[in-house]
Amino acid sequence: MAEEVIHPFSGLLILDLCSEIAGPYASKLFVDAGARVIKIEPRGGDPLRRWTASFQKLEEGASSPLYQYLNAGKESILLDPRDAQDRAHIAELAARADLVFEDWGAGGLEERGLDPNAWLKANPRLGIVRLSPWGQEGPWSRFPANDFTLQAATGSVDYRGLPERYPVAAGGRIGDWVGGTFAAISGIAAWRSACQTGDGQIADVSIFEAMIQCFTIFGDMGSQFTGGLLDRSIEIPSIEPTKDGHIGFCTITGQQWTDFCSMIGRQDIAENERYMDARNRMADFEFISGAIQEATREKTTAEWVELCEMLRIPVTPIGNGGTLPAMDHMIEREAFQLAPGGFHQPRAPWRLESCQPREIGTTSALDEDRAEVLDLLDDEPVQPEVDFGDGDLPFAGLRVVDLTAFWAGPYTTSILSDLGAEVIKVESIQRPDGMRFATPIRNEILWEWSHVFHGVNPGKRDVTLRLDDEDGLGLLKRLIGEADIVIENFSARVMPAFGLDAETVRGLNSRAIFVRMPAFGLSGPWKDRAGFAMTVEQVSGLAWVTGYEDLPLVVRGVCDPLGSAHAVFALSLALEERERTGLGQVVEVALVEPALAVAAEQVIEASAHGVVLGRDGNRMPHAAPQGLFETREADERVAISVTTDAEWKSLCALLGADDWRLSESLSTHAGRYAAHDALCARVSAWARPQSRDEILEQLRSAGVPASAAINNHALWPNEQLKARRFFQTLDHPVTGKTRYPSFPTAFSHFERELHSSPPPTLGQHNREILQGELEVPEDEYDRLEEAGVIGTRPSFI
């Protein structure tokens, strides 16, 4: 008899009351890690069972490939909350569960006769994750919304695109995947806290707030530092034509920009300081873009990749559902797996040394597992013993040595800090975190004015150590010796070059968990390539479904925080493994793999149905009509999106469109999608004479998703965010009182304001850490400072 495989979350019981994408993705992550997940479905089942983006006709009773990807390995039971006995069954199952995920909207459980507080009374350690567009409370909490209208409300749509053309939203319903990812780590937080305290709680996740963290590049912080509105733009360079296709470039740093200009033979542009500022490149778009494309068309994609690799300029081929599985890097890393349904899907987006993700399970038909699920009710609920920890926050008592830079890594440790961990950020005065310099502000201490650095580094202490110096490296090793977690996000070659490979870290501290987040992983032909979020968006397919029909555009940064949240999830698995074995291990979360996981629909559609999904501005397969509509005020657009039959009927009634309401061809989503442009033209004619506020009031009252498409720098003031206390004001040593976005979940047992301190200045805690904790003598401290091993100002300024 085969030995039972133990996974990190073996033994966890989770109820999934969710449908579509967000909630099912959250619970899918737990399935991959070994949890038992029971999917509770309404009559008719999850609508995603019958959905394909290419409008395929599925066999009777068959579940769509995307549904299978999200729900394989879960047990299905049909329980209708309108039925008293079914409501009782749901409550009895909740009494035996560790976590419940639900997405029925603000007050949705209560409206269906279900009482989450009664569930907590019956099962005091239960974590209830409530996922909704705006959150459970606040003046907007019951406004209809979806991914498209939420994107518009964050301010992320208005600034994406060419100034002479219309703004475009990100494709692929990426906001739903973002919401699901943050729901998963909110579930982790509630569950770990319950294990430490014995107290369960409700985690109220706002998809809107999660999308603010992921889509806006901290635009509200930018508005505080620079003022004014943000112009619509695209990245230069980004996705450019080659002799045989397209290629994706990314020049985040000044060095990458000048090297790129030299590579294309435009030393004149490289030497023009005006173009070090990306805003000036956009202002001279025709000249700069023309110069770039004149050069890029002269070589093949492969030739440009080879040149960029030599110069360490982030580069990638452009991926889509058809090309991704055939890329050499994806093949070598086995990034895609064959599902039982016969299509290809991304593997779980994490790798641990101690275990593999659970094998892909089969997909249950609706109510297929009813008998097995109800058998659970024959046994009395068992409450596990409490392992009292260092506090109620889930990562309290853990020390993190943070070697990361830019966004994905620092935001990972920011989440850990918010949720209780002690984080020591390590920089050097020779090479501070490069994100410190991503700012248009030019003053004597500009490195303390980067809005993204501020956004991803609250709650940390900062020490500077020169790692190519024996003394600096020695001090870092002492910190590692006392750490629970060490984390870095450079390409695979960087840490070993400093003498900090996995074996060295293990030798310093056998219990340390070494989290590594290179763009493309620790193996494969691309492992030494540098890469940022835009690079990952270009290759993963996210850019392929975003933009104009003739021009794919990057989503702008979303892959960084997505990678961060997945890294927190993966780290939680390693912590469970350490409880079992007493040992740390390497945790690998290649930034590209969470992106592949949330862009999965493209590879799934291509492999299952032979259809390569594309892009067409704001027209997307899941909604019709959908678009940004002009109002009578200039630049005050309204985002409107119809995804359900009920919303369609409400729109027809509001517009007095009896012909639409009675049309047989428009009675289905497929029919409406076929008539999309004509529908949008009529909605546009209705909206254009009215004010934005008038339109929003009518649509929201009618139950049609709609939001103002605000400027990226106009998020605040916002009555919903104020009511939810989403922003936390902290007094920074340089920028003064500054408004910071917080974690997008309101926990019933945690403080809402989770940032323990403002972001640190460079080397702010050198004395506190080196002298106070490592007991470096005063004369030695002075010598290190004199030698440039430590310091508080960049050595090159």
For each of these PLM feature ranges, what is it?
Residues 154-170, 540-554, 749-750:
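The feature captures the short pre-catalytic strand/loop hairpin that immediately precedes
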Residues 37, 76-78, 128, 202-204, ...:
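Conserved beta-strand scaffold positions in the cores of enzyme catalytic domains, especially
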Residues 46-61, 150-157, 432-448, 536-542, ...:
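Mobile, glycine-enriched helix-loop/loop "lid" segments at the mouths of ligand-binding/catalytic clefts
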Residues 83, 99-158, 469, 488-544:
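N-terminal Rossmann-like NAD(P) cofactor-binding subdomain of oxidoreductases
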